Structures are given as C-alpha cells and as structure tokens.
C-alpha cells in the first residue's frame, strides 16, 4: 500500500441526460452541483489551500457563454465558491427562472453538462488565486478550449519552460500547471487545424466542421 500523502483533490462529473431529467427525478436541475459539492467536501481533509470549480455547456449557441469558473482561497473555499454561484442566481434571476431547467440551460452560468472541481494543495511553495485550478485556455473555436485541473508536481520545469519558448510562445507565468496547459493547448490547436483541413477537403463548410 502506498503511504498517505497530502494531495490535490479532483472531481469530474459528465451528465448523460438533460437538466430537465434531474429536475423531474430529484426536484432540482442543480442536483449535479450538489453532488460536486459533496464530492469536494469528502476530499477536504487533504489540507487544501483553495478550491475551484468549472462548468461547460455542451450545446450553447453562438453568442452564448459556455465555459464558467469560480475559485476561492482559504479553508472555507469550497462553500465560498458555491455560495458565490448561488448568490449570483438569487441576484440576477427570478425564482421561476431559477427553477426552470430549460431556462437555466440557456441563460444561467454553471447549468451545463460537464462539471469539474479541484482542491489545491501546494507542493511548490507558491500560493495565490492565480495558482488555484481549474485553469482555462479560452478560444473562439470551441474545440480549442481547455479546462485543466490536476494532482502533480513537475520536476523539469526549466526544460518544459524552454520548450514553450522554442515553440515561439511567450509564457506569462512560471508554473508547472500553466506549462502543461500551454503544451496541451499547442497540440490541441495543431490537431484541430489538421482535422479542419481534412474536413474542408471533403467539402464540408466551416460551421458544419466546428
């Protein structure tokens, strides 16, 4: 058996049914958010210094936001993150709108199909909200977006940092999670462009491809 260590906590939930299903079965479309909270609380004893959540809407239309993130620092970071989200609901929407899963799916943040949670335990000595996962890499092309959280500590940061520079990038911070995000993003960009080119040769139109 491996020894017990202080590690980051990670949660991921992928819904296979629409929000209306959870509204009908559990009385609220926010059921996956409640599960996310519970699963993060069960990992709280890992000594986290901060917490963050992210959500992706898989069926958003152009002009609609589809990636959301909330982060906080401190021992009460988990309830703070969720309370901030719920207070936003109460401030910006009516009770009828909040209880309508179809309205929420289109208009409300954190009403999506993919949820991610992270509890940060620092192994590098660096702290601050900028180091709390999930990390986001945003792009107007949906296929090029990334949300990343992990439990790792790279020992070859200088080498990975220099690889990014050699690729022509200009890293904006020195952090292993950021390096990994940009390396993955670089490869994702290349792959999306490769597949896009193949689809164009097959006669498909831009929006049809994406």
Model-flagged regions — what are they?
Residues 1-210:
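Conserved short alpha-helical segments that host acidic/polar catalytic motifs at enzyme active sites
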């Amino acid at each position: 058996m491996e020894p017990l260590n202080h590690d980051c906590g990670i949660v991921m939930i992928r819904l296979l049914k629409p929000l209306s299903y959870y509204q009908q079965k559990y009385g609220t479309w926010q059921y996956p958010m409640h599960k996310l909270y519970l699963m993060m609380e069960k990992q709280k004893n890992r000594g986290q210094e901060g917490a963050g959540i992210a959500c992706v809407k898989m069926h958003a239309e152009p002009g609609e936001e589809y990636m959301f993130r909330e982060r906080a620092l401190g021992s009460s970071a988990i309830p703070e993150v969720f309370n901030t989200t719920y207070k936003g609901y109460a401030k910006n929407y009516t009770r009828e709108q909040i209880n309508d899963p179809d309205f929420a799916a289109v208009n409300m943040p954190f009403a999506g199909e993919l949820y991610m949670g992270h509890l940060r335990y620092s192994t590098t000595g660096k702290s601050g909200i900028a180091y709390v996962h999930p990390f986001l890499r945003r792009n107007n092309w949906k296929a090029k977006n990334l949300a990343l959280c992990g439990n790792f500590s790279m020992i070859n940061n200088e080498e990975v940092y220099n690889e990014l520079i050699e690729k022509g990038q200009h890293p904006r911070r020195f952090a292993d999670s950021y390096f990994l995000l940009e390396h993955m993003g670089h490869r994702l960009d290349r792959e999306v462009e490769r597949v896009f080119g193949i689809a164009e040769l097959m006669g498909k139109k831009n929006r049809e491809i994406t």
